[in-house]
Amino acid sequence: MKKVLDLFLLLLLPLVFCSTVFAACIEGSCLNGKGTYIMANGTKYVGEFKDKQMNGQGTLTYTNGTKYVGEFKNNQMNGQGTLTYKDGKKYIGEFQDNWYHGQGTLTYKDGRKYIGEFRWGEYHGQGTLTYVNGRIDNGIWSF
């Protein structure tokens, strides 16, 4: 019985270690400079680093197909950027702390398009929402 248990552990142990995913800098300098970093969940960042954080220009590609190309500050989307979702939804504009924040354009997969101001991910301020059928809602938005 002990031999069976030992054999089982011997065969199981490599599988446990092989299935473990580690975060790693796979290219360049992920301390200060430009590099490629793969996160433990499979998300990939290619771009500029400062003090081991995403800072400057970069591309963040999530495992679900969502992709952000733009500016980062302290590991967050901050500044100008483009966020494209797998389903076709797309935001081009300003970000703050990973939120749509400031001026931007949000295009939905069904063709609707909002151009205007955002605050913390919501329409807020002057903006225009155009529907596929031609209807236009224009004005001051508030959340």
Model-derived features with residue positions:
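Positively charged n-region of N-terminal signal peptides that target proteins for export
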Residues: M1-L5
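Glycine/tyrosine- and acidic-biased, solvent-exposed loop/turn segments at the edges of beta-strands
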Residues: S19-F143
